[in-house]
């Protein structure tokens, strides 16, 4: 329920569900009745979104249908056989000014996750669109990517 029905609209829901489960295992019933009630109310009142579920199911369908891409050369460890010595250098997103970077590793213009207008997903929509715009404008030229 917390992942499939609520998802990113209220990312705390998965923690609430996990905490409730752990408490039920630790203290048992009937003592954990209130814990379960609190978790159930949280889930019932949380905004709902299945965008995360739809995204992973779409990605899995792509894989099943053979529409996959090889691992980008810059992601293959320099210690592995088969890495070309002239492969593009890995550009760590941790070192990018925004902590995310513009490197698009998929290599194709394909989108799986589309946030809804529900809950916290509504707040994620614009930053995600901004990131996608920056990645499109950066293109595949390693010189235009964030270091």
PLM region descriptions:
Residues 1-98, 107-108, 112-147:
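Terminal-proximal interaction/regulatory segments of ATP-powered molecular machines
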């Amino acid at each position: 329920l917390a992942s499939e029905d609520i998802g990113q609209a209220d990312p705390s829901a998965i923690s609430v569900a996990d905490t409730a489960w752990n408490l039920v295992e630790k203290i048992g019933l009937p003592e954990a009745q209130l814990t379960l009630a609190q978790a159930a109310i949280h889930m019932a009142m949380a905004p709902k979104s299945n965008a995360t579920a739809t995204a992973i199911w779409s990605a899995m369908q792509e894989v099943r249908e053979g529409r996959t891409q090889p691992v980008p050369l810059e992601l293959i460890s320099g210690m592995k056989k088969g890495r070309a010595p002239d492969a593009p250098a890995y550009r760590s997103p941790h070192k990018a000014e925004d902590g995310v970077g513009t490197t698009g590793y998929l290599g194709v213009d394909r989108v799986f996750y589309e946030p809804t207008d529900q809950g916290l997903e509504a707040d994620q929509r614009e930053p995600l669109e901004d990131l996608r715009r920056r990645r499109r404008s950066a293109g595949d030229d390693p010189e235009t990517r964030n270091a």
